[in-house]
Amino acid sequence: MTAQQTILNTSAKNATRAGARVWILQPEVQHYRLPVLDGVQARGRADGAYEIAVFGGLDAKGECIGGGTREYVRSLPLQQGKILGVPTAWWPGFEQLLRDEKPDALVMLGNPRMRQCWTLPTLARSMGIPVIAWSKVHSYSRLAWISNVLKPRFFKRFDRVIVYGESARKELVALGIADSHIFVAQNTIDTRRIFTDADRITKRGEELRKGAGLTGRRLLLCIGRMDAEKRHQDLLDAWPRLKAIDPDLSLVIVSGGPLLEEIRAKARAIDPAAILVTGRVPEGDDYAWISTCDIGIYPGAVGLAINISLAFGKPTIIADERGSDSEILEHGATGWRYARGDLDGMIACVKNVIDDPQASRAVCDRARTLMRDTVTIDNMVSKIDSAIRVAVSMQTGKHPRP
C-alpha cells in the first residue's frame, strides 16, 4: 500500500460518523464519477443522515483512475480471473472488511461477472446490512447472453437496485423486480462546465483544431475507447462515401485502447490527409474536441461521450442500441439513430445533418435543453441519495425487504 492509499484509508475511517456509514463498492474509482460521489456525500452530510466510503481500484499513485483524490476513497484493488473461460472479477478481502467494520448499508456494482455479487448480499443480510445493486442492467459485450440468462435470479438477491435509465427499469420490472424497489439515476457525466465555462473550452477546441491543421474543415468526431464493441471500423469502411458528401469533411477519432495502433494504421492507409487518430488525450481535451467538432458520431457501445456532445448542442449520431446510456438520444428529436452496423443508414444520417442545417439546429437545441434541465448530475445524485436513505431506513424497519 502506498503512503497516499494509507492516507485515504485513514481519512475515510476517521470521517465524521454522526449518521449512518454507507459503503460504495466499485471495480475502479474513476475520476469522472467524482462529481456524482461528491454530490452524494454532500447530500448525506447536509442533514447528518449518512457518510460514504468508496472502495475500488486506484492508480499506481494512489489516485482515482484519471486523477484526483478524496477523503472518502479507500483502495481495494480488483482481481481478475476466469470461470469456465468466462472473465470474472472479485475484491480480495472485502468480506473480512465487512465483518470488521460493519457499515449500515452497502451499494455495490451489480454485474453477474462480479463473483461477490452472488455471495455478499447473503453475508450482508446475515449481518443486518441492506445491499443496493448499482447496474446498467443491459450489456452489449459478446458474453451478454450469459448475463441475460442469469438476470432474473441475480437481481432478486438485492434489497434495492439503482439503474442508469428507464429502459433498465422496464427490463427489471419485466423480470419480476418490484417497481418500487428500483431507482432510476439517469447516467451522465458532469456537463455543468459546458454551460458555465463554454468559452474557455471552445477556445481550447479551436487550438486543437488549428494544431491539427483542420481549420476550416467540417469535423466528424468519434470519441470512444478503441475496442471492437465501439465499431470504429464501420467509420473507416464508410469513409470514402462519407467524404463524397462533402470534400471538406475530416474524421477525428479520439481515445486509446487495445485497437489504437490497428485503427491508426488503417486510417493512415485509407486517407492520411483527412483522418486523424489522436490516441488518448489529456483530461479536458475530450470536451474541447467535442466543442470544436461539427458532428459527433458513435457507431457502437454508446457511452457518456454522447452526453457531452448533446450538451454542447452538436448534431449527434449513434448506432440504434438498447441501453440506458443511449436512451436520451431520440431519433429526430434529440439526435439521429441508424441500425447498428448499417453503413447506408450511417451515411444517410450524416447527409441529413449536412443537407438540412435548419432542422438539425432544432434537434440540437432540444438536446441541449434536455442536458441542461433533465439529464444532470444533480438529478442523478438525488436518485442515488433516495435509494441510500431507503436502505438505511431498513435498519429501523421503515421499508420492507424484498
Where are these regions (language model features)?
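Conserved donor-binding/catalytic core segment of Leloir-type glycosyltransferases
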Residues: 23, 214-230, 236-239
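A short, histidine- and acid-enriched strand-loop-helix "catalytic/donor-clamping" loop
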Residues: 115, 127-146, 157-160
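Donor nucleotide-sugar binding/catalytic pocket of nucleotide-sugar-dependent glycosyltransferases
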Residues: 156-206, 214-215, 277-278
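Nucleotide-activated donor-binding/catalytic signature segment of Leloir-type glycosyltransferases, i.e.
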Residues: 261-281
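Short alpha-helical donor nucleotide-sugar binding micro-motif in glycosyltransferases
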Residues: 280-281, 287-293, 309-310
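Acidic donor-binding loop of glycosyltransferase active sites
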Residues: 291-302, 314-315
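Conserved acidic donor-binding segment of nucleotide-sugar-dependent glycosyltransferases
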Residues: 331-332, 336-343, 352-358
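A short, well-ordered alpha-helix in the C-terminal region of glycosyltransferases
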Residues: 345, 352, 359-374
